[in-house]
Amino acid sequence: MPPKKKLAAVVKVQLPAGQATPAPPVGTALGPHGVNIMEFCKQYNAATESQRGNIIPVEISIYEDRSFSFVTKTPPAPALILKAAGLEKGASTPSRSVAGSITRDQVREIAQTKLPDLNTTSLEAAEKIIAGTARSMGIEVK
């Protein structure tokens, strides 16, 4: 069994699915670590091609020999909520105005999508987390 690679850094970035390029933010995040940026872009784009149109958070583990591995996460909850509500952005004053609304079914669907990345295993708790996020954005849950 080969010895384990020694971890040098972990970089977290949010990139459009299937559209990573060596330009910032990828280049500025990976450049100082000496990683082959084009290779990362090719692998990331291939891994996220099916989710095109979403912003996908990615956690890149960089090793001392300049190799890397990465783990993609689910899209951010606010992005999924805005997409479900058909909005560009939330309310400017969430406590006073309502930007739009989403249904309980849409909240359940978003919660099921986000469940692997949330710190709960219960779907009901995940729904409450998503509903709270929507409320803080000025989006009503009906």
Swiss-Prot record:
The keyword Nuclease does not apply. It holds the Pfam family Ribosomal_L11_N. It comes from the Bacteria. GO terms for cellular component: cytosolic large ribosomal subunit. SUPFAM superfamilies: Ribosomal L11/L12e N-terminal domain, Ribosomal protein L11, C-terminal domain. InterPro entries: Ribosomal_uL11, Ribosomal_uL11_bac-typ, Ribosomal_uL11_C, Ribosomal_uL11_C_sf, Ribosomal_uL11_N, Ribosomal_uL11_N_sf. Keywords: Methylation, Ribonucleoprotein, Ribosomal protein, RNA-binding, rRNA-binding. GO terms for biological process: translation. One of its GO terms (molecular function) is large ribosomal subunit rRNA binding. One or more lysine residues are methylated. CDD domains: Ribosomal_L11 (cd00349). Part of the ribosomal stalk of the 50S ribosomal subunit. Interacts with L10 and the large rRNA to form the base of the stalk. L10 forms an elongated spine to which L12 dimers bind in a sequential fashion forming a multimeric L10(L12)X complex. Forms part of the ribosomal stalk which helps the ribosome interact with GTP-bound translation factors. Belongs to the universal ribosomal protein uL11 family. This is Large ribosomal subunit protein uL11. It comes from Thermobifida fusca (strain YX). The lineage of its organism: Bacteria, Bacillati, Actinomycetota, Actinomycetes, Streptosporangiales. The gene is rplK.
